[in-house]
UniProtKB/Swiss-Prot annotation:
Name the record gives this protein: Protein LST4
Keywords: Amino-acid transport, Protein transport, Transport
GO biological process: amino acid transport; cellular response to amino acid stimulus; positive regulation of TORC1 signaling; protein transport
PROSITE patterns the UniProt entry points to: DENN_FNIP12
InterPro entries the UniProt entry points to: DENN_FNIP1/2, LST4_longin
All residue ranges annotated as the uDENN FNIP1/2-type domain in the record: 34-223
Ranges for domain cDENN FNIP1/2-type: 231-723
Membrane recorded as keyword: no
Signal sequence bounds: none
Protein's job: Involved in extracellular amino acid uptake. Required for the protein trafficking from the Golgi to the plasma membrane.
Occurrences of domain dDENN FNIP1/2-type (ranges): 731-836
Domain of life: Eukaryota
The organism of origin for this protein: Candida glabrata (strain ATCC 2001 / BCRC 20586 / JCM 3761 / NBRC 0622 / NRRL Y-65 / CBS 138)
Family: Belongs to the LST4 family.
């Protein structure tokens, strides 16, 4: 945690709105610009003599900016760019111990407070050493004599962390407990063991505070927000169409597993999290948004939408997302009256080849009246083609001037131009050096990366151990599905190879691509600048690996592309599709008058930081309207964040006797039934986006795939027993590279048969007779369920399949009224989100 969090720079505005509810600012602006948290650790001991001059003894006084006692300048302690005055240890004693008159009870006190005029806060534990405070070896320190001495452990931190103290209190309490145990183990002789205490701070406390202060958390939209529900179903359909291929089993199984075991808040004795590993943040964030739409607790307050101006795209530039005004004068309206352009395609049915031209090169739209969602479709003169084999190297590139060697296996190598690198100046080719064969479209998921996987897999039942038939859902979905592709310009359609395209790549047109026996790549023929561009793009979904939507029709396989891009070609119906072009267009558009798809989600009308929502502006505006003199008649203002409290402001009225009354404020509290609904919490749950490394303090996250990730997760699960004080900690581990799902469980067990003084037991667990047992089990792999499938999970998977099919039928039927469709979609989503095992 020494480095600052940097992850928002690679996200577009639409992804930020989906994940965070607003266009989050770049890293640094929201974290205060602090590279690290500076602290001061102070351990003091107080004896029982009130009149003694040597009443206090300093055991440890350490500062992160130097060595020894503070190690700073003598007159200041620096916190980032803000200088805080230096506070002597004698002055801190007064804040730590307070009055010298003690209470009769010998209790442990945990407290925190801000030191006036110092921009610092104190976190303190004051305790009496007693025999229940065992050390690390489960025994009491030697030569210890019970006395009235009081020991204090104090952490001095910058005051800007005040809002994060309460959120991190479980981790702070765990750090204080571990520090107390280490202190008892040393018999209060800390000079030789100072590094141990500093290590505890750097491993347990500082990472927890920085995680709460710097890493943005997901905003879980209200469960009845129709714009969010439309966006959620679109992402689900896009995922199924572009990522599932012929076996529609991965996502339904993952949703069912999440609903049953990971949706609700865990019990006090249990702690769980969801971790996604992927090499591409676009794919990972899509899955984070899908799973986050099912988790709890959700925001339950009134939402106001902030309207921002929309910039008009030009043919020469890419479409830039509208920027957030950030001014206090922003207006708030309902989300149905605002439109912002989007790069998100409508659900599930648009497969496209990478266009070789810059996006939005043409601005002519096709307007089609329909009942579902609108999407901008751009005309083009480019003709499509379909193929049943892999892509070949363009033969027209062959020349004698230069050559590039590609490995000569029995299979073809893929050279694909990523959409994220489309440019008219310099676009290198991206080489997929994995072995491809004609079994590509029939092999199991992840076979590109596992050379040991041979043979082909048929469309068998993915949940072969007693679960519902996924193949039925697959064929049913494909029947109702609308498949189309955006393809590049090709003079000859229906051929198995590309003709020579336009030379807009920035490469030498005389480069020859030939098959040789060498293993060299394209890199040695490129300039250093072009080699830099070959690195994986954060905006391309091909970087993970393209899951081809294979079909058994004569038309062959289709190539899915990123759902984050909108091409400039006209969609063409695939061979073997079950709908004509009119039905295709009608099934993926709404009945908006302008006929253009608009991203349904907008900026929510309140500020937020990384960990919480800020309703200061809305509350201030509400109270200003209450107390201002000139008030509109019968004006109603709804306070945020609580949707169950409404403030009604009535203007001056005359009663029956002609007496004019002053404006009155009536607060109506809606109490459903006999239970009072909870106020929406400002603090957001610990769910976050794609991070550069595993963070054990978050319950939902996506990270890059590494070899050590499972060990890090197990280590994070063991830390839960310190901070959360739980008995079971488990993680749902999702690997996008191998399309597998694992469950990692660490459980605390009590050893009954083993004596407490046994030598083969962990010394830390001798006094309590407990030990930790870990288990890693694979629950889903190669498109099938590999573990034991319970009837509860089987029923939930079938329910998710039926719900997705019902939603798909509503979106694909152009005759359904928009209002009726919204009502039905809302009921379907609520049925999925509130799936109850006991009611099935």
């Amino acid at each position: 945690m020494g480095e600052r969090f940097e992850g928002l720079e690679n996200l577009n505005d639409e992804c930020k709105v989906k994940l965070f509810g607003c266009r989050m600012r770049a890293p640094g602006s929201g974290t205060g610009g602090h590279e690290s948290i500076e602290y001061r650790l102070l351990i003091l001991e107080e004896n029982a003599e009130m009149v003694c001059r040597q009443r206090y003894r300093t055991i440890l006084d350490y500062s992160s900016r130097g060595h020894g006692s503070m190690g700073l300048k003598h007159d200041e302690m620096t916190n980032g760019n803000v200088s805080a005055p230096f506070i002597t240890a004698s002055e801190l004693r007064q804040y730590i111990y307070g009055s010298p008159i003690r209470s009769k009870t010998r209790v442990t006190e945990d407290k925190f407070r801000i030191i006036p005029n110092s921009r610092q806060l104190l976190i303190t534990r004051v305790f009496y050493p007693r025999r229940t405070s065992m050390n690390l070896h489960g025994t009491f320190p030697k030569n210890y004599q019970s006395s009235d001495r009081r020991v204090s452990i104090t952490m001095c931190l910058p005051s800007y962390l005040l809002a994060d103290i309460s959120d991190s209190w479980a981790d702070i309490d765990g750090w204080l407990t571990q520090t107390e145990r280490h202190l008892m183990a040393t018999s209060f002789h800390v000079v030789e063991t100072q590094d141990n205490f500093v290590t505890l701070v750097n491993k347990l406390l500082i990472p927890a505070l920085r995680s709460c202060h710097e890493i943005p958390r997901l905003f879980l939209y209200p469960q009845d927000n129709i714009d969010f529900i439309h966006t959620w179903f679109k992402d689900v359909f896009n995922w199924i169409e572009l990522k599932e291929g012929t076996k529609l089993s991965f996502l339904p199984f993952l949703i069912a597993k999440t609903l049953i075991e990971y949706r609700d808040d865990p019990q006090e004795s249990e702690c769980h999290r969801i971790v996604i590993t992927s090499g591409n943040l676009v794919i990972a964030n899509k899955l984070v948004f899908i799973l986050g739409g099912l988790l709890k607790p959700r925001y339950d307050g009134e939402m106001k939408i902030m309207i921002t101006p929309v910039s008009t795209p030009t043919p020469s530039n890419h479409l830039m997302p509208p920027s957030m005004n950030g001014s206090n004068e922003s207006s708030y309206h309902s989300s149905s009256n605002s439109h912002t352009p989007s790069k998100l395609k409508i659900p599930a049915t648009i497969n496209e080849h990478r266009p070789s031209r810059p996006r939005y090169s043409s601005t002519e739209n096709i307007h089609v009246q329909s009942r579902t969602m609108d999407i901008p479709i751009v005309k083009s003169d480019q003709s499509p083609f379909s193929t049943s084999r892999g892509w070949k190297i363009p033969s027209s590139y062959r020349s004698a001037t230069s050559s590039v060697s590609i490995s000569s296996d029995e299979s073809l190598a893929e050279v694909i131009q990523p959409s994220s690198l489309k440019s008219t100046t310099s676009i290198p080719f991206q080489n997929f050096s994995s072995s491809l064969s004609n079994q590509l479209y029939s092999s199991s998921y992840g076979s590109w990366f596992n050379g040991s996987i041979t043979g082909s897999f048929t469309n068998s039942n993915p949940l072969s151990n007693g679960t519902s038939n996924m193949a039925t859902f697959s064929s049913s979905f494909k029947k109702n599905n609308i498949s189309s592709i955006f393809q590049s310009n090709s003079p000859t359609a229906g051929t198995d190879s590309w003709e020579r395209p336009e030379n807009n790549t920035g490469l030498n047109p005389n480069i020859t691509l030939q098959r040789t026996a060498s293993n060299s790549s394209l890199r040695h023929m490129l300039t250093p600048y072009q080699q830099q561009l070959i690195s994986p793009s954060t905006n391309s979904e091909y970087d993970e690996y393209p899951w081809f939507g294979a079909t058994n029709n004569a038309g062959g396989a289709t190539v899915g592309t990123s759902s984050e891009t909108v091409g400039s070609q006209q969609p063409v119906l695939l061979q073997g599709a079950h709908m004509d072009t009119t039905t295709l267009l009608d099934s993926i558009r709404t009945s908006n008058n302008n006929g253009a798809y608009t991203f349904p989600l907008k900026n929510v009308g309140f500020d937020r930081d990384c960990s919480s929502l800020d309703h200061h502006k809305l509350l201030t505006s509400c109270f200003e309207e209450i107390f201002e003199g000139d008030i509109d008649a019968n004006k109603v203002t709804t306070m945020v964040p609580c949707s169950d409290i409404a403030v009604h402001i009535h203007s001056k009225q005359e009663d029956s006797e002609g007496v004019t009354s002053h404006p009155r404020v009536v607060i109506d509290v809606d109490i459903p039934g006999t239970t009072i609904s909870k106020y929406p919490e400002e603090l957001l749950p610990r769910y976050t986006m794609y991070l550069s490394h595993f963070n054990p303090f978050f319950k939902l996250q996506a990270i890059p795939a590494t070899n050590e990730i499972e060990n890090k997760i197990v280590h994070g699960l063991k830390r839960d027993f310190i901070s959360e004080k739980c008995d079971v900690s488990k993680t749902l581990f999702i690997s996008m590279r191998s399309r597998s799902i694992k469950e990692i469980v660490v459980r605390k067990t009590t050893s009954i048969n083993t004596p407490s003084n046994s030598s083969n037991q962990d010394p830390r667990n001798k006094s309590k007779g407990s030990m930790l047992k870990q288990k890693i089990k694979k629950v889903f792999s190669n498109g099938t369920c590999t573990g034991r499938v319970t009837p509860v999970l089987n029923n939930c998977v079938a329910f998710v399949e039926a719900a997705l099919m019902s939603a798909m039928s509503l979106y694909s039927d152009p005759t359904i009224d928009k209002k009726y469709r919204d009502e039905r979609i809302l009921k379907i989503f609520l049925a999925v989100a509130h799936y109850n095992v006991d009611e099935v």
